[in-house]
Curated annotation (Swiss-Prot):
<keyword id="KW-0234">DNA repair</keyword>
<dbReference type="InterPro" id="IPR001238">
    <property type="entry name" value="DNA-binding_RecF"/>
</dbReference>
<dbReference type="InterPro" id="IPR003395">
    <property type="entry name" value="RecF/RecN/SMC_N"/>
</dbReference>
<dbReference type="GO" id="GO:0006260">
    <property type="term" value="P:DNA replication"/>
</dbReference>
<feature type="binding site">
    <location>
        <begin position="33"/>
        <end position="40"/>
    </location>
    <ligand>
        <name>ATP</name>
    </ligand>
</feature>
<comment type="function">
    <text>The RecF protein is involved in DNA metabolism; it is required for DNA replication and normal SOS inducibility. RecF binds preferentially to single-stranded, linear DNA. It also seems to bind ATP.</text>
</comment>
<dbReference type="InterPro" id="IPR042174">
    <property type="entry name" value="RecF_2"/>
</dbReference>
<dbReference type="GO" id="GO:0009432">
    <property type="term" value="P:SOS response"/>
</dbReference>
<comment type="similarity">
    <text>Belongs to the RecF family.</text>
</comment>
<keyword id="KW-0227">DNA damage</keyword>
<keyword id="KW-0963">Cytoplasm</keyword>
<dbReference type="GO" id="GO:0000731">
    <property type="term" value="P:DNA synthesis involved in DNA repair"/>
</dbReference>
<keyword id="KW-0238">DNA-binding</keyword>
<keyword id="KW-0547">Nucleotide-binding</keyword>
<keyword id="KW-0235">DNA replication</keyword>
<dbReference type="GO" id="GO:0006302">
    <property type="term" value="P:double-strand break repair"/>
</dbReference>
<dbReference type="InterPro" id="IPR018078">
    <property type="entry name" value="DNA-binding_RecF_CS"/>
</dbReference>
Length: 360
């Protein structure tokens, strides 16, 4: 099994840090400090070495230290392809982000070729009651760990969708180019939808197989394209192309694409109660979310033989003793690099003896 883990992390002008240097190894790491000390900022910096905008989905301008024009995050990381140096830097003046792998520029969506990562934050605990966009992105991040090419597909789809919207809204009369774009969107949509469905099948099996202290969930996806595939419809690409063609006039008025895999919703049910997670208590929602993360970690390791980095922000807060102890035993048993934030060690004293403590 390959372990993805950080050997070192360096921050320059990042959030509240002027300069920070951390040396780590493939063990659990506990970041301990008062609220506002920068614990979550460190997790966010690590999460930037995975496709997307990090665990906060922050705008570039917000990650640079106040009054500074640039910031830099550097990591020496044991990746899928071996030991490598990764950097990502931002310039407030140009609003650009540049990511490099061993001093060669790479696209953000290429990061899943090198790294594997899972995170759980307090913000995510509201994912079941927030908009479908957050749940869909959560599902797609899960897919990245099973299929690294999925990130590139999602990025390409969003690019072509933006181009289509621009042509329609600006009334650019180029039917041939529009047709080509819609055909590309349709082909990519087919791959995205199939990847999601395959991953959901893996995940459901993982949830059903894993006996633990957290509630089991039933996972599904509510999307026209995914449903057509499940129903056995043939010529999916042609179907999507036709739908995009038929909605041109409507989308021109709306200024956006009203049909496609970007409208799908990731649905989660409490298995025992047979109700959607959004109708469960906040405590149950957190427990269900943890159960999904555990299943993802467990099955990703079994299926891909790769142990991802796990980032847990204040995850032990409000967990009862039984669930907290189970979670600690489960995670330490996976033999992976685990980053945990906390304001104190109450309830996790034994876990702390096996971890690297970093006080902020």
């Amino acid at each position: 099994m390959k372990n993805i883990f950080l050997h070192s992390l360096s921050l320059e002008n990042y959030r509240n840090f002027k300069n920070l240097e951390l040396k780590t190894d493939n063990t659990p790491i506990i970041l301990i400090g008062e609220n506002g000390s920068g614990k979550t900022n460190i997790l966010e910096a690590i999460s930037l070495f995975y496709p997307g905008r990090g665990l906060r989905s922050a705008k570039l301008a917000n990650v640079c230290k106040t009054s500074e024009d640039h910031c830099l995050v550097k990591a020496l990381l044991q990746s899928k392809l071996g030991l490598a140096e990764f950097t990502t830097q931002f310039k407030r003046s140009s609003n650009r982000r540049i990511t490099e792998y061993n001093e060669s520029k790479i696209a953000n969506n290429e990061l899943s070729k090198f790294t594997s990562m899972v995170w759980l934050t307090p913000h995510m605990e509201g994912i079941f009651t927030s908009g479908s966009n957050d749940r869909r992105k959560f599902l797609d991040r899960i897919v990245y760990n099973f299929d690294p090419k999925h990130a590139e597909l999602v990025s390409k789809y969003e690019y072509y969708m933006h181009e289509r919207n621009k042509i329609l809204v600006e009334d650019i009369r180029d039917d041939n180019w529009l047709k080509i774009i819609e055909e590309k969107m349709a082909d990519i949509s087919n791959h995205i939808a199939n990847n999601r469905l395959k991953t959901l099948e893996f995940m459901q099996q993982a949830i059903d197989d894993l006996e633990n202290e957290f509630p089991k969930a039933d996972l599904s996806i509510d999307g026209i394209v995914e449903q057509k595939i499940l129903n056995g419809k043939e010529n999916i690409v042609s179907f999507i192309t036709a739908e995009l063609y038929q909605t041109r006039s409507k989308d021109k008025l709306l200024g956006r694409t009203s049909f496609g895999v970007h409208k799908s919703d990731f649905l989660v049910k409490h298995q025992k109660k047979n109700i959607l997670a959004k109708f469960c208590s906040t405590g149950e929602q957190k427990a269900i979310l943890i159960a999904i993360i555990l299943a993802e970690m467990n099955y990703a390791i079994k299926l891909t033989k790769i142990a991802p980095i796990l980032l847990l922000d204040e995850v032990f807060v409000h967990l009862d003793d039984k669930r907290r102890q189970y979670l600690i035993e489960f995670l330490t048993g996976l033999n992976m690099q685990l980053w945990v934030t906390t304001t104190n060690l109450e309830g996790i004293e034994n876990f702390a003896t096996k971890a690297q403590l970093i006080k902020l």
